């Protein structure tokens, strides 16, 4: 008989046993028993006998005749038990007893058949041994990162569903940086119970849950570098008649129905919210008188001269408001005509609002309004930047008026203009106080230094078509990441230091000419629309981890986020504005997401063709999270489409938000 090594776990590759004495089985086995299982008392004795054989020395042999030409040293499939009495000893004992019983059955079959032919080992033995090998290798694996639980599990992560626990998920998508995880813990603790609203005290600097990551343009003062005395914006004042000759805003009054209250508003009129059916809500509706293409808050955190409650809101207005197919609204070719930007001064505490400036320019329609928060000067309100239909980025100084009297100005020369002769700039974002990254009509991406804007730092192709959105993901713990979305439907993220080797595809969706993408710094994630009815979030360092947030039966057209809290606003083509808490989705596990992730409709615009009347519905409606729903998008009246929505991002006014529809009705509310 073959020699059985001692202190080996598992059953060896045994040679054919020619004869086994009946004494070892306690009772004879009949010849016609075949594959019948032996009686239980024989099984117990067989288990005891084979257990003794395992504990025998290497030179001990079974008292049977050894078969010739059998290599008894082939024991490579054994797993040595060198761990002593480890914590898995009980499980190993059970597995070993099961192995012994299986071996006993095979020996019984050999005796009953009387054949000397070799028998192929059962598949169960190989399975158990593979499981044992896997368990031992996992147990002995050393984690590459201290504190990592994923490294100890040794499981590949390819999809979000592979991260079942919240701890594993957070480790994979955010990393193990303790300072970063501490900030995320503050956000989770302070806002995870805030389903549709949040405490005002949590966004105050003295709150233990206060987290505010400043954008790249705010890192340092850059006014002297970017503008200074050489690049002043040139204006000249005009009167109201001259303005009306250049800009044809709406002249007729708009009929409104707010709750149960009928009203008519002319251009420039403001109406506060009446007492609504679901309670008192603080805010107002302002008739801009044209198509609002974008809005932007100047986030003044500390200003002792005017008070912390005073904020400025810039509103870009087009005079072509009632014709969606007007040739002046084209986006793929260069266009030059007159348009205007209105500057509002507002007290976020009392919600007193006054229009202080109207700036007329000839750059065509403008979008991507952004205040350069690093440009400060005593004579300025701020420095406003935007993309225009001319295919340029323009920077304007907004001069501070001595009074709140409304003035009209004509811009003759901007402070700074960025452009290339080969293609039109379509979108941009800040990389630092002195650099911006731009997307172009031809699919290229470029970086401009504002101190030397004539030639870009780089000019590389990323897409094959018109780039719709560029957004920078900034963090104190990783390099800045840039995302781009184009008409072809590709969503890429990359490190601008090395685009070729870092470009990663986040997703691919159907092509569209409206795919909003914004960066939410509190959860280090991009919030974006798929060009249709779904709102999603993806961390910038884990492109595979796409989290659905909201699914609607209409196209999502505008997204608003804040650096102070994780609440996300989403406007849609059917006139709805909804709010959801993205932190509840990203900072929890993937299980029961439909129960924890909800969204709330705040407002809904409607339009009656028969009565030529706009109605705003203030009733709340809760939507559950649904995934993979069939799109049921409908065609709605163009006047109710939400064109833009923005949070105020200051501690004093952090609960204020504004949004506008295509009819030029600007709505502002203080969330309470």
From Swiss-Prot:
GO cellular component terms given for this protein: nucleus; transcription factor TFIIIC complex
Domain of life according to the entry: Eukaryota
Biased composition, class Acidic residues, residue ranges: 71-100
Subcellular location(s) of the protein: Nucleus
Presence of the UniProt keyword Manganese in the record: no
Gene Ontology molecular function: any one: RNA polymerase III general transcription initiation factor activity
Region listing for Required for DNA-binding, in residue ranges: 1-158
Keyword Nucleus among UniProt keywords: yes
Disulfide bonds listed in the record: 375-383
Subunit text: Heterodimer with TFC8. Component of the TFIIIC complex composed of TFC1, TFC3, TFC4, TFC6, TFC7 and TFC8. The subunits are organized in two globular domains, tauA and tauB, connected by a proteolysis-sensitive and flexible linker. Interacts with TFC1, TFC3, TFC4 and directly with TFC8.
Additional remark text: Present with 1130 molecules/cell in log phase SD medium.
Protein name according to UniProt: Transcription factor tau 91 kDa subunit
Source organism (scientific name): Saccharomyces cerevisiae (strain ATCC 204508 / S288c) (Baker's yeast)
Gene of this entry: TFC6
